[in-house]
C-alpha cells in the first residue's frame, strides 16, 4: 500500500490493535449532541465567526477585516494495516477540514496515542512519517505534536489554516435551488470493512487507499466561485449525515438522486458480501428519522462512514457551469447528485 522505509513482520497488522477504524470510530451524532450540550453559561466572542453552533468542519477566527484563522483537529484508530499509509490517511483527513472551509493550511501538529508495550516505537515512527508525507504534499510543516501511552493506536493532526474572509464557505449557508456535487466516490467504509473482515482481494487493496490519500486541495479553488453557497467534507457521518447538516443549517430539503451517487469500484461487490461497517448502523440510528424510507442497500451507501472523503458542494444554477469546468480541469467527474429546495415534507432528504 505504500513505500514504507522499514519492512514490518507479517504478524503486525495495525487494524488488529483497534476496535474501530478511521472515521467509523466517530461518536454517533445523537450521542455527540448530548456531550456538547454544555450546562455552563454561554460565552461569546464576536471574532469567532464559526464555532460549534453550526457543526461545521472547523472553527474560524477573524484576525482583521480581511483574514481569518482556521483551526481544526481530527484523529482516529488504524483503518489500514500499513503504518505509513495509516499516518498518511489520518493526516490527509485532518487537513481536509481546512479545504472544506475554503482555506489554505499553513501548519500542523501531530496527535499520537500508542500502546508502547504492544507495538514497537519504530512502527509509530512510520505512522508519523506517513503524516509528515501528507503534510509535505499539502505544502505545510509538521511542526510538533503530543504523544501518550494509549491502549490502542491513535493518530491525527491539529491543523491551522488561513482564509480570505470573502472566500469563507460554511456548511449551513446553502440556498434553495442550489445543485449538489460530490468530489469523491462513496464506499470507503465498505471497502475498509472488507479488509477488516479479511474479504478484500489483494488487487483491490489500492482502491480505498488511493481515494483516502487524495488531498481535497480543490476546495480552496472551489471557494473562490461566488456562486458556491455551501461546502463541507463527507466523513464519518456518511453522505446522508453531512447532507442533513447542510439542510438543517439552511432550513432546506435535499432532493437526492440516489442512482447518481458515485461509488468506488467494487464497492457494490463487497457490499453484497456483507461488508457493512458498524458506523453505518450507528449513523442511521442517529439521523434516520430525517430520511425517507430506505432499503438496506440504500442505507448501506448513504450512511457509509467515509474516511478522508470528498467535498459536498452546493452551487447556484448560475455558477454551475463554472464549477463543472473546474472539476473537469482537475479530472473529477462533474456529476450532479441532487438539489436543494424549500421544504415541503418533514424529511430533510428525499430520494428520486
Curated annotation (Swiss-Prot):
> Matching HAMAP family, A to Z?
SelD
Q: Which CDD domains match?
A: SelD (cd02195)
- What family is reported? Belongs to the selenophosphate synthase 1 family. Class I subfamily.
Instruction: Indicate yes or no for the key word Kinase.
Output: yes
- According to UniProt, where does the site described as Important for catalytic activity lie? 26
Q: Which reaction does it catalyse?
A: hydrogenselenide + ATP + H2O = selenophosphate + AMP + phosphate + 2 H(+)
Q: Name one GO cellular component term.
A: cytoplasm
EC number(s)? 2.7.9.3
Q: What is this protein called?
A: Selenide, water dikinase
What domain of life does the UniProt record list for this protein's source?
Answer: Bacteria
- Tell me, how does this one assemble? Homodimer.
Q: GO molecular function terms here?
A: ATP binding; magnesium ion binding; selenide, water dikinase activity
- Co-factor remark: Binds 1 Mg(2+) ion per monomer.
- Name the job this protein performs: Synthesizes selenophosphate from selenide and ATP.
Q: Where does Mg(2+) bind?
A: 57, 97, 233
PANTHER family per record: INACTIVE SELENIDE, WATER DIKINASE-LIKE PROTEIN-RELATED, SELENIDE, WATER DIKINASE
Is Kinase one of the keywords? yes
- List the active-site residues: 23
Amino acid at each position: 500500500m505504500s513505500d514504507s522505509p522499514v519492512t514490518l513482520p507479517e504478524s503486525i497488522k495495525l487494524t488488529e490493535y483497534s476496535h474501530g477504524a478511521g472515521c467509523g470510530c466517530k461518536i454517533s451524532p445523537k450521542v455527540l449532541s448530548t456531550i456538547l450540550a454544555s450546562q455552563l453559561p454561554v460565552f461569546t466572542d464576536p471574532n469567532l465567526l464559526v464555532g460549534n453552533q453550526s457543526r461545521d468542519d472547523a472553527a474560524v477566527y477573524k484576525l482583521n477585516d480581511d483574514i481569518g484563522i482556521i483551526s481544526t483537529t481530527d484523529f482516529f484508530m488504524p483503518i489500514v494495516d500499513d503504518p505509513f499509509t495509516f499516518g498518511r490517511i489520518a493526516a490527509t483527513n485532518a487537513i481536509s477540514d481546512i479545504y472544506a472551509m475554503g482555506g489554505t493550511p499553513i501548519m500542523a501538529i501531530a496527535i499520537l496515542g500508542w500502546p508502547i508495550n504492544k507495538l514497537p516505537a519504530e512502527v509509530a515512527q512510520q505512522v508519523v512519517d506517513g503524516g509528515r508525507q501528507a503534510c509535505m504534499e499539502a505544502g505545510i510543516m509538521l511542526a510538533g505534536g503530543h504523544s501518550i501511552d494509549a491502549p490502542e493506536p491513535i493518530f491525527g493532526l491539529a491543523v491551522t489554516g488561513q482564509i480570505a474572509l470573502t472566500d469563507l464557505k460554511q456548511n449551513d449557508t446553502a440556498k434553495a435551488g442550489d445543485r449538489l456535487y460530490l468530489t469523491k466516490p462513496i464506499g470507503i467504509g465498505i471497502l475498509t470493512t472488507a479488509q477488516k473482515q479479511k474479504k478484500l482481494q489483494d488487487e483491490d487493496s489500492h482502491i480505498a487507499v488511493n481515494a483516502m490519500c487524495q488531498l481535497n486541495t480543490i476546495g480552496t479553488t472551489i471557494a473562490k466561485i461566488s456562486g458556491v453557497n455551501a461546502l463541507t467534507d463527507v466523513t464519518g457521518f456518511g453522505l446522508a449525515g453531512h447532507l442533513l447538516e447542510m439542510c438543517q443549517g439552511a432550513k432546506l430539503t435535499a432532493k437526492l438522486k440516489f442512482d447518481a451517487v458515485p461509488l468506488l469500484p467494487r464497492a457494490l461487490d463487497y457490499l453484497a458480501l456483507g461488508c457493512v461497517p458498524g458506523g453505518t448502523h450507528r449513523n442511521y440510528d442517529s439521523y434516520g428519522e430525517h430520511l425517507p424510507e430506505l432499503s438496506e442497500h440504500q442505507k448501506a451507501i448513504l450512511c457509509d462512514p467515509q474516511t478522508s472523503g470528498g467535498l459536498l458542494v452546493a452551487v447556484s444554477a448560475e455558477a454551475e457551469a463554472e464549477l463543472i469546468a473546474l472539476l473537469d480541469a482537475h479530472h473529477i467527474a462533474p456529476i450532479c447528485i441532487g438539489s436543494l429546495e424549500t421544504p415541503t415534507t418533514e424529511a430533510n432528504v428525499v430520494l428520486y
